[in-house]
Regions:
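Phosphate/diphosphate ligand-binding glycine-rich loop within oxidoreductases
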Residues: 2-115
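Glycine-rich adenosine-cofactor-binding loop
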Residues: 8, 100-105, 112, 116-144, ...
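Alpha-helix N-cap/loop-to-helix initiation residues
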Residues: 12-13, 132, 154
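Adenosine-cofactor binding site in Rossmann-like domains, unifying the SAM/SAH pocket
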Residues: 152-158
């Protein structure tokens, strides 16, 4: 049985495990989704070693940036954003290869692109949290100037 999972800390708020396990069952996919609540990103190595069936991981707070140093490769988008939320795990012989991606930018950009008209030149991004980096990248890829709105005073925000 293939395994997939989520790494982060804490994970009590996450609905991923029940969501994906229900999808696997409904689609007849022989797979399991597991939450790996790890207090340190250094625990990732132990998870990989003790779960050789792992094919992929979702990554949530606080590890979207910290996980990058554990990866063998990172997609250009995730590299530019500086955050990874999907890790593809490949096994080649005794070697485990970890590839990082950012699906936030793909989902956001594809969902907003049909609504962007030629007269749209600027966009406000509300917040400066993790997803805002992906949103900023997506908006810029569509040719829009961006401004961040934050509740905290930071350079480059209003």
């Amino acid at each position: 049985m293939d395994k997939y999972g989520l790494i982060g800390y804490p994970l009590g708020h996450s609905f991923s495990k029940s969501y994906f396990n229900e999808k696997f069952e409904n689609e007849g996919i022989n797979a399991e989704y597991i939450n790996f609540e790890i207090p340190s990103i250094g625990d990732l190595t132990e998870i990989l070693d003790s779960n050789p069936e792992l094919k992929g991981l979702n990554v949530t707070i606080p590890y979207k940036e910290k996980v990058i140093s554990y990866l063998d490769s990172v997609s250009p988008e995730a590299n530019a954003i500086g955050a990874v939320n999907v890790v593809k795990i490949e096994h080649k012989g005794d070697e485990t290869i970890l590839k990082g991606y950012n699906s936030d930018v793909i989902g956001f950009t594809q969902s907003i692109e049909p609504f962007v008209e030629s007269y749209h030149k600027k966009a406000l991004i509300l917040g400066t949290g993790g997803a805002s980096k992906a949103i900023n990248y997506g908006l810029k890829s569509l040719g829009l100037e961006t401004v961040f709105v934050s509740r905290y005073e930071r350079p480059g925000t209003i």
